[in-house]
């Protein structure tokens, strides 16, 4: 896949720092809360359904990992449905289940920044 140009917008909300990452046909939202600065929460990662399996999600996730490292975070955490293809995708990308989610259908998954390859 050719290199994607990613637009990153950082927004300081006073109690948290939000990052919005946009590429053609994909986007994500990240949050670092002042009360838990070592954890970056990945609340959204979306790729246009017609454009999946082209490496866009992986490219976005690589940028998420880069932002986590640069922000001094130790962990990237997210919540996903137990029985979804997304859970399998995150497992293949190094995330591990760490707890049940906020409802019985979800699982919280995390990836330790020290386990991120590159640079």
Where do the model's predicted regions map?
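Short intrinsically disordered terminal tails
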Residues: 1-2, 91, 116-119
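Conserved acetyl-CoA-binding loop of GNAT-fold acetyltransferases
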Residues: 91-100
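Generic leucine side-chain signal with a strong bias for well-ordered alpha-helical environments
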Residues: 42-45, 61, 78, 86
């Amino acid at each position: 896949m050719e290199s994607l140009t990613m637009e990153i917008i950082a927004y300081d909300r006073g109690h948290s720092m939000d990052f919005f990452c946009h590429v053609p046909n994909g986007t994500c939202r990240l949050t670092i809360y002042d009360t838990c600065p070592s954890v970056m929460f990945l609340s959204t990662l979306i790729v246009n359904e017609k454009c999946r399996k082209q490496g866009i999600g992986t490219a976005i996730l690589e940028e998420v990992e880069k932002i986590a490292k640069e922000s001094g975070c130790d962990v990237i955490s997210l919540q996903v449905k137990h029985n979804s293809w997304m859970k399998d995708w995150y497992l293949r990308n190094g995330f591990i289940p760490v707890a049940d989610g906020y409802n019985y259908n979800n699982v919280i998954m995390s990836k330790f920044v020290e386990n991120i390859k590159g640079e």
